[in-house]
């Protein structure tokens, strides 16, 4: 097919060269250029340059296709990684929200516990203060009674010493001694 095309082109281009006159004249530059061109095309065809160029173009097209496929695969992998990282980021965000919610709940529970502990501490201190007040009252009442008894004894001593004679005092002492002897034996 290529050979037929080359011959047809040669015949089509040589007729204007012959029309210029003179036949096969090398002085005609158009004819020389056509011959050089045909010789160049013939050499290219003989060396199978078109098939080599075709192979190189096919190889380059194949390498471009493989690069495109590799780029497409890398893009899909990147999209998969991006989706994976987005899911992980959402999971981390949800976990952080759970941690914050748990911390808030624990803080609220700790605050409630602190309130309860404070109320219990206040109640204990109030009870201790009431007990101290009751003890102080009892101590004050005892001191007042003891003082009243002491004063009463002193007053009674003064009254008895003013009203009692020595004979009456001796009778009371003897009676007290007999009473003690009776209780001891």
Curated annotation (Swiss-Prot):
Any Pfam family: ATP-synt_B
Membrane-protein topology: Single-pass membrane protein
Segments crossing the lipid bilayer: 4-24
Cellular location(s): Cell inner membrane
Keyword Transport among record annotations: yes
CDD domains xref list: ATP-synt_Fo_b (cd06503)
GO MF annotation terms: proton-transporting ATP synthase activity, rotational mechanism; proton-transporting ATPase activity, rotational mechanism
One Gene Ontology cellular component annotation held by this UniProt entry: plasma membrane
UniProt function note: F(1)F(0) ATP synthase produces ATP from ADP in the presence of a proton or sodium gradient. F-type ATPases consist of two structural domains, F(1) containing the extramembraneous catalytic core and F(0) containing the membrane proton channel, linked together by a central stalk and a peripheral stalk. During catalysis, ATP synthesis in the catalytic domain of F(1) is coupled via a rotary mechanism of the central stalk subunits to proton translocation.
PANTHER family found in the cross-reference section: ATP SYNTHASE SUBUNIT B, ATP SYNTHASE SUBUNIT B', CHLOROPLASTIC
Protein name, per record: ATP synthase subunit b 1
Organism for this UniProt entry: Ruegeria sp. (strain TM1040)
Gene name linked to the record: atpF1
């Amino acid at each position: 097919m290529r050979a037929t095309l080359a011959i047809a082109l040669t015949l089509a281009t040589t007729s204007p060269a012959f029309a210029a006159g003179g036949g096969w004249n090398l002085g005609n530059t158009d004819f020389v250029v056509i011959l050089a061109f045909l010789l160049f095309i013939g050499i290219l065809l003989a060396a199978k340059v078109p098939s080599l160029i075709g192979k190189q173009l096919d190889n380059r097209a194949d390498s471009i296709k493989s690069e495109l496929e590799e780029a497409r695969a890398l893009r899909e992998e990147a999209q998969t990684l991006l989706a994976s990282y987005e899911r992980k980021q959402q999971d981390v965000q949800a976990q952080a929200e759970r941690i914050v919610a748990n911390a808030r709940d624990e803080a609220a529970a700790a605050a409630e516990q602190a309130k309860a502990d404070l109320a219990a501490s206040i109640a204990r201190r109030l009870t201790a203060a009431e007990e101290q007040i009751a003890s102080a009252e009892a101590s004050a009442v005892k001191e007042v009674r003891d003082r009243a008894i002491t004063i009463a004894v002193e007053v009674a001593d003064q009254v008895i010493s003013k009203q009692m004679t020595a004979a009456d005092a001796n009778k009371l002492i003897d009676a007290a001694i007999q009473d003690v002897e009776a209780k001891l034996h």
